[in-house]
Protein backbone atom coordinates (compact mmCIF):
# COMPACT_ATOMS: atom_id res chain seq x y z
CA UNK A 1 0.00 0.00 0.00
CA UNK A 2 1.34 3.44 -0.91
CA UNK A 3 1.74 6.04 1.86
CA UNK A 4 -0.96 8.69 1.99
CA UNK A 5 -0.49 12.38 2.59
CA UNK A 6 -0.17 13.38 6.22
CA UNK A 7 -3.30 14.49 8.09
CA UNK A 8 -3.56 16.64 11.21
CA UNK A 9 -3.63 13.48 13.37
CA UNK A 10 -0.49 11.99 11.82
CA UNK A 11 3.18 12.76 12.24
CA UNK A 12 4.31 15.19 9.53
CA UNK A 13 6.44 13.42 6.89
CA UNK A 14 10.18 13.99 7.14
CA UNK A 15 13.10 14.03 4.71
CA UNK A 16 13.73 10.42 5.73
CA UNK A 17 10.19 9.50 4.65
CA UNK A 18 10.67 11.25 1.30
CA UNK A 19 13.98 9.46 0.74
CA UNK A 20 12.38 6.10 1.54
CA UNK A 21 9.42 6.76 -0.77
CA UNK A 22 11.67 7.92 -3.63
CA UNK A 23 14.22 5.16 -2.94
CA UNK A 24 17.08 7.67 -2.77
CA UNK A 25 19.45 8.88 -0.09
CA UNK A 26 18.64 11.77 2.27
CA UNK A 27 21.51 13.76 0.75
CA UNK A 28 19.76 13.71 -2.63
CA UNK A 29 16.52 14.95 -1.06
CA UNK A 30 18.39 17.76 0.73
CA UNK A 31 20.03 18.80 -2.53
CA UNK A 32 16.65 18.88 -4.23
CA UNK A 33 15.14 21.03 -1.47
CA UNK A 34 18.10 23.41 -1.62
CA UNK A 35 17.71 23.83 -5.37
CA UNK A 36 20.95 22.00 -6.25
CA UNK A 37 19.36 20.44 -9.33
CA UNK A 38 22.59 20.26 -11.35
CA UNK A 39 23.87 17.54 -9.04
CA UNK A 40 20.78 15.37 -9.62
CA UNK A 41 19.70 13.49 -12.73
CA UNK A 42 16.34 14.29 -14.26
CA UNK A 43 15.00 10.87 -13.28
CA UNK A 44 16.12 11.39 -9.68
CA UNK A 45 14.53 14.83 -9.50
CA UNK A 46 11.26 13.43 -10.83
CA UNK A 47 11.18 10.61 -8.24
CA UNK A 48 11.82 13.05 -5.39
CA UNK A 49 9.19 15.44 -6.69
CA UNK A 50 6.63 12.65 -6.91
CA UNK A 51 7.48 11.42 -3.41
CA UNK A 52 7.02 14.92 -1.97
CA UNK A 53 3.61 15.18 -3.65
CA UNK A 54 2.52 11.72 -2.52
CA UNK A 55 3.47 12.31 1.11
CA UNK A 56 2.35 15.93 1.27
CA UNK A 57 5.80 16.84 2.54
CA UNK A 58 6.48 20.45 3.50
CA UNK A 59 10.03 21.40 4.47
CA UNK A 60 10.62 22.98 7.89
CA UNK A 61 11.81 26.39 6.76
CA UNK A 62 12.78 27.39 10.30
CA UNK A 63 15.04 24.39 10.73
CA UNK A 64 16.56 24.83 7.28
CA UNK A 65 17.15 28.51 7.95
CA UNK A 66 18.84 27.81 11.27
CA UNK A 67 21.10 25.25 9.62
CA UNK A 68 22.17 27.81 7.02
CA UNK A 69 22.35 30.62 9.57
CA UNK A 70 19.53 32.55 7.82
CA UNK A 71 15.86 32.54 8.80
CA UNK A 72 14.75 35.56 6.72
CA UNK A 73 12.66 36.59 9.73
CA UNK A 74 12.50 40.04 11.33
CA UNK A 75 11.09 40.64 14.80
CA UNK A 76 9.20 43.79 15.73
CA UNK A 77 7.98 44.92 19.15
CA UNK A 78 5.54 47.83 19.32
CA UNK A 79 4.50 49.62 22.49
CA UNK A 80 0.79 49.83 21.68
CA UNK A 81 -0.87 48.24 18.65
CA UNK A 82 -4.08 50.21 19.30
CA UNK A 83 -2.18 53.43 18.55
CA UNK A 84 -2.65 54.42 14.87
CA UNK A 85 0.97 55.58 14.88
CA UNK A 86 2.17 52.04 15.64
CA UNK A 87 -0.05 50.52 12.97
CA UNK A 88 1.20 52.86 10.25
CA UNK A 89 4.85 52.38 11.24
CA UNK A 90 4.30 48.62 11.16
CA UNK A 91 2.87 48.91 7.64
CA UNK A 92 6.06 50.65 6.55
CA UNK A 93 8.24 47.96 8.10
CA UNK A 94 6.15 45.20 6.53
CA UNK A 95 6.24 46.80 3.07
CA UNK A 96 10.03 47.02 3.26
CA UNK A 97 10.21 43.40 4.45
CA UNK A 98 8.26 42.25 1.41
CA UNK A 99 10.61 44.11 -0.91
CA UNK A 100 13.67 42.67 0.81
CA UNK A 101 12.37 39.09 1.06
CA UNK A 102 11.87 38.93 4.83
CA UNK A 103 8.95 37.78 6.98
CA UNK A 104 7.82 40.02 9.85
CA UNK A 105 6.86 38.78 13.33
CA UNK A 106 5.07 41.48 15.36
CA UNK A 107 4.58 41.51 19.14
CA UNK A 108 2.47 44.07 21.03
CA UNK A 109 3.81 44.86 24.50
CA UNK A 110 0.61 46.77 25.35
CA UNK A 111 2.63 49.37 27.28
CA UNK A 112 3.80 46.71 29.75
CA UNK A 113 7.52 46.71 30.45
CA UNK A 114 7.72 43.10 31.58
CA UNK A 115 5.79 41.91 28.53
CA UNK A 116 8.20 43.87 26.35
CA UNK A 117 11.14 42.00 27.92
CA UNK A 118 9.46 38.64 27.40
CA UNK A 119 8.72 39.33 23.75
CA UNK A 120 12.31 40.38 23.09
CA UNK A 121 13.51 37.13 24.66
CA UNK A 122 10.99 35.18 22.58
CA UNK A 123 12.00 36.78 19.30
CA UNK A 124 15.67 36.31 20.06
CA UNK A 125 15.05 32.62 20.74
CA UNK A 126 13.23 32.36 17.41
CA UNK A 127 16.54 33.33 15.79
CA UNK A 128 15.21 36.38 14.00
CA UNK A 129 17.90 38.06 11.92
CA UNK A 130 17.18 41.51 13.31
CA UNK A 131 14.85 43.51 15.55
CA UNK A 132 12.84 46.70 15.09
CA UNK A 133 11.70 48.08 18.44
CA UNK A 134 9.41 50.91 19.50
CA UNK A 135 10.14 50.52 23.22
CA UNK A 136 8.00 51.66 26.11
CA UNK A 137 10.98 52.68 28.17
CA UNK A 138 13.14 49.59 28.44
CA UNK A 139 16.44 50.37 30.21
CA UNK A 140 19.32 50.88 27.80
CA UNK A 141 21.26 48.04 29.40
CA UNK A 142 18.53 45.59 28.35
CA UNK A 143 18.74 46.73 24.74
CA UNK A 144 22.54 46.85 24.93
CA UNK A 145 22.65 43.16 25.85
CA UNK A 146 20.80 42.38 22.60
CA UNK A 147 23.01 44.62 20.50
CA UNK A 148 26.20 43.37 22.14
CA UNK A 149 25.18 39.79 21.35
CA UNK A 150 25.51 40.64 17.67
CA UNK A 151 21.82 40.87 16.79
CA UNK A 152 21.14 43.89 14.53
CA UNK A 153 18.76 46.33 16.19
CA UNK A 154 16.94 49.51 15.12
CA UNK A 155 14.97 51.67 17.54
CA UNK A 156 11.94 53.69 16.43
CA UNK A 157 10.80 56.97 17.99
CA UNK A 158 13.17 56.75 20.96
CA UNK A 159 16.64 58.13 21.55
CA UNK A 160 19.13 56.00 23.51
CA UNK A 161 22.19 58.12 24.23
CA UNK A 162 24.53 55.37 25.33
CA UNK A 163 23.38 52.64 22.94
CA UNK A 164 25.28 51.94 19.74
CA UNK A 165 22.44 51.14 17.37
CA UNK A 166 20.54 52.88 14.57
CA UNK A 167 17.50 55.01 15.38
CA UNK A 168 14.70 56.30 13.15
CA UNK A 169 11.85 58.62 14.04
CA UNK A 170 10.37 62.08 14.01
CA UNK A 171 12.42 65.21 14.62
CA UNK A 172 10.43 65.84 17.78
CA UNK A 173 12.04 69.15 18.63
CA UNK A 174 11.42 70.58 15.17
CA UNK A 175 7.83 69.35 15.10
CA UNK A 176 6.95 70.58 18.60
CA UNK A 177 8.57 73.96 17.96
CA UNK A 178 6.64 74.30 14.68
CA UNK A 179 3.35 73.57 16.44
CA UNK A 180 4.06 75.89 19.37
CA UNK A 181 5.06 78.78 17.10
CA UNK A 182 1.78 78.33 15.24
CA UNK A 183 -0.21 78.53 18.48
CA UNK A 184 1.57 81.71 19.56
CA UNK A 185 1.07 83.30 16.15
CA UNK A 186 -2.65 82.54 16.45
CA UNK A 187 -2.85 84.56 19.66
CA UNK A 188 -2.75 81.81 22.29
CA UNK A 189 -0.92 82.92 25.43
CA UNK A 190 -0.97 79.79 27.60
CA UNK A 191 0.04 76.45 26.10
CA UNK A 192 -0.85 73.34 28.10
CA UNK A 193 0.98 70.16 27.10
CA UNK A 194 -1.22 67.13 27.84
CA UNK A 195 0.84 63.95 27.72
CA UNK A 196 1.12 60.46 29.06
CA UNK A 197 3.77 60.14 31.82
CA UNK A 198 7.06 61.34 30.34
CA UNK A 199 9.42 59.16 32.38
CA UNK A 200 12.41 58.06 30.32
CA UNK A 201 10.62 58.29 26.97
CA UNK A 202 12.76 60.63 24.90
CA UNK A 203 10.11 61.58 22.33
CA UNK A 204 7.81 62.95 25.03
CA UNK A 205 10.56 64.84 26.85
CA UNK A 206 11.90 66.34 23.60
CA UNK A 207 8.44 67.60 22.66
CA UNK A 208 7.91 69.16 26.07
CA UNK A 209 11.35 70.80 26.08
CA UNK A 210 10.90 72.30 22.62
CA UNK A 211 7.47 73.66 23.55
CA UNK A 212 8.83 75.33 26.68
CA UNK A 213 11.81 76.80 24.84
CA UNK A 214 9.60 78.44 22.21
CA UNK A 215 7.21 79.82 24.84
CA UNK A 216 10.10 81.14 26.96
CA UNK A 217 11.58 82.88 23.93
CA UNK A 218 8.25 84.62 23.30
CA UNK A 219 8.78 86.65 26.48
CA UNK A 220 6.51 87.86 29.25
CA UNK A 221 2.81 87.28 28.96
CA UNK A 222 3.20 83.73 27.67
CA UNK A 223 3.25 80.54 29.72
CA UNK A 224 3.63 76.79 29.32
CA UNK A 225 2.51 73.97 31.57
CA UNK A 226 2.70 70.19 31.45
CA UNK A 227 -0.12 67.87 32.47
CA UNK A 228 0.91 64.20 32.75
CA UNK A 229 -2.04 61.82 32.68
CA UNK A 230 -2.72 58.11 32.80
CA UNK A 231 -4.92 57.25 29.82
CA UNK A 232 -7.13 55.08 32.00
CA UNK A 233 -7.86 57.87 34.52
CA UNK A 234 -10.80 59.69 32.95
CA UNK A 235 -11.57 61.55 36.19
CA UNK A 236 -8.09 63.09 36.31
CA UNK A 237 -8.42 64.14 32.67
CA UNK A 238 -11.79 65.79 33.28
CA UNK A 239 -10.41 67.65 36.29
CA UNK A 240 -7.39 68.87 34.30
CA UNK A 241 -9.64 70.07 31.48
CA UNK A 242 -11.88 72.02 33.87
CA UNK A 243 -8.86 73.79 35.35
CA UNK A 244 -7.51 74.61 31.91
CA UNK A 245 -10.83 76.05 30.76
CA UNK A 246 -10.83 78.42 33.75
CA UNK A 247 -7.55 80.04 32.69
CA UNK A 248 -7.77 83.82 32.30
CA UNK A 249 -5.32 83.72 29.39
CA UNK A 250 -6.31 82.60 25.92
CA UNK A 251 -5.29 78.96 26.21
CA UNK A 252 -4.58 76.03 23.94
CA UNK A 253 -4.08 72.37 24.67
CA UNK A 254 -1.22 70.63 22.88
CA UNK A 255 -1.91 66.86 23.00
CA UNK A 256 1.25 64.75 23.05
CA UNK A 257 0.01 61.95 20.76
CA UNK A 258 -3.01 60.70 18.86
CA UNK A 259 -4.54 58.77 21.75
CA UNK A 260 -4.24 61.72 24.10
CA UNK A 261 -5.77 63.98 21.45
CA UNK A 262 -8.80 61.71 21.15
CA UNK A 263 -9.32 61.59 24.92
CA UNK A 264 -8.94 65.37 25.23
CA UNK A 265 -11.36 66.03 22.36
CA UNK A 266 -13.97 63.70 23.87
CA UNK A 267 -13.45 65.23 27.31
CA UNK A 268 -13.92 68.76 26.00
CA UNK A 269 -17.13 67.76 24.22
CA UNK A 270 -18.48 66.20 27.42
CA UNK A 271 -17.80 69.49 29.21
CA UNK A 272 -19.56 71.44 26.47
CA UNK A 273 -16.39 73.25 25.43
CA UNK A 274 -15.89 74.34 21.83
CA UNK A 275 -12.69 74.77 19.89
CA UNK A 276 -11.38 77.30 19.11
CA UNK A 277 -14.02 79.54 20.79
CA UNK A 278 -13.38 78.29 24.34
CA UNK A 279 -9.95 76.78 23.90
CA UNK A 280 -7.43 76.01 21.17
CA UNK A 281 -6.60 72.39 20.40
CA UNK A 282 -3.65 70.85 18.57
CA UNK A 283 -2.30 67.32 18.59
CA UNK A 284 0.67 65.25 17.58
CA UNK A 285 -0.27 62.80 14.83
CA UNK A 286 -3.02 63.59 12.36
CA UNK A 287 -5.66 60.86 12.68
CA UNK A 288 -8.33 60.64 10.00
CA UNK A 289 -11.09 61.69 12.37
CA UNK A 290 -9.36 65.00 13.24
CA UNK A 291 -10.65 66.66 10.07
CA UNK A 292 -14.24 65.76 11.02
CA UNK A 293 -14.27 66.84 14.68
CA UNK A 294 -15.97 70.20 15.11
CA UNK A 295 -14.21 72.76 12.95
CA UNK A 296 -11.38 70.29 12.43
CA UNK A 297 -8.36 69.78 14.69
CA UNK A 298 -4.92 71.10 13.80
CA UNK A 299 -2.21 68.46 13.99
CA UNK A 300 1.38 67.51 13.37
CA UNK A 301 1.45 64.88 10.66
CA UNK A 302 4.23 62.32 10.95
CA UNK A 303 5.60 60.36 7.96
CA UNK A 304 4.94 57.17 9.89
CA UNK A 305 5.00 54.80 6.91
CA UNK A 306 8.34 56.24 5.78
CA UNK A 307 9.72 55.94 9.30
CA UNK A 308 8.92 52.22 9.37
CA UNK A 309 10.29 51.66 5.88
CA UNK A 310 13.55 53.48 6.70
CA UNK A 311 13.96 51.49 9.91
CA UNK A 312 13.83 48.19 8.03
CA UNK A 313 16.21 49.49 5.36
CA UNK A 314 18.71 50.39 8.09
CA UNK A 315 18.26 46.97 9.67
CA UNK A 316 18.84 45.02 6.45
CA UNK A 317 22.02 46.99 5.83
CA UNK A 318 23.26 45.88 9.25
CA UNK A 319 22.22 42.29 8.57
CA UNK A 320 24.19 42.43 5.33
CA UNK A 321 27.28 43.44 7.27
CA UNK A 322 27.58 47.20 6.86
CA UNK A 323 29.91 48.65 9.50
CA UNK A 324 29.51 52.29 10.52
CA UNK A 325 28.86 54.42 13.59
CA UNK A 326 25.29 54.38 14.89
CA UNK A 327 22.99 56.35 12.60
CA UNK A 328 20.02 58.59 13.39
CA UNK A 329 17.42 59.51 10.76
CA UNK A 330 14.95 62.15 11.96
CA UNK A 331 12.02 63.01 9.70
CA UNK A 332 10.44 66.49 9.88
CA UNK A 333 6.85 66.88 10.99
CA UNK A 334 4.23 68.68 8.88
CA UNK A 335 1.78 71.18 10.36
CA UNK A 336 -1.80 70.59 9.20
CA UNK A 337 -3.83 73.68 10.09
CA UNK A 338 -7.57 73.40 10.78
CA UNK A 339 -10.20 75.35 12.66
CA UNK A 340 -9.27 74.30 16.21
CA UNK A 341 -6.44 76.83 16.32
CA UNK A 342 -8.28 79.72 14.68
CA UNK A 343 -7.09 83.21 15.62
CA UNK A 344 -9.21 85.11 18.13
CA UNK A 345 -10.17 87.73 15.51
CA UNK A 346 -11.45 85.06 13.13
CA UNK A 347 -13.39 83.32 15.90
CA UNK A 348 -15.06 86.58 16.96
CA UNK A 349 -16.04 87.40 13.38
CA UNK A 350 -17.72 84.04 12.86
Question: Model segments located where?
Answer:
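Flexible loop/hinge segments that line or gate small-molecule binding clefts
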Residues: 111, 134-181, 198, 259, ...
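Hinge/beta->alpha junction and helix N-cap segments in small-molecule ligand-binding domains
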Residues: 78-88, 107-115, 168-178, 194-240, ...
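Short acidic capping loops at alpha-helix termini that bridge into adjacent secondary structure
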Residues: 189-190, 222-224, 274-280
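N-terminal helix-turn-helix DNA-binding module of bacterial transcription factors
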Residues: 1-71
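Short beta-strand segments enriched in small/hydrophobic residues
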Residues: 21, 26-30, 66-81, 182, ...
Amino acid sequence: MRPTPSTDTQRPPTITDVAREAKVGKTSVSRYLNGEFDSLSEALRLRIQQAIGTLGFRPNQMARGLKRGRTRMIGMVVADISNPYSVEVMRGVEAACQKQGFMLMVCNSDNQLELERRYLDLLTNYRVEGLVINPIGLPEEDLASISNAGLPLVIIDRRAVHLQCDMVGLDNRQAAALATQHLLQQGFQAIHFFTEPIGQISSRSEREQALRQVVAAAGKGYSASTVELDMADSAALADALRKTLKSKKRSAIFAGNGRMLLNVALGLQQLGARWPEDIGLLGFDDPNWAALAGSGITGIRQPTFDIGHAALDFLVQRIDGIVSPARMQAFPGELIVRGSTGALKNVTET
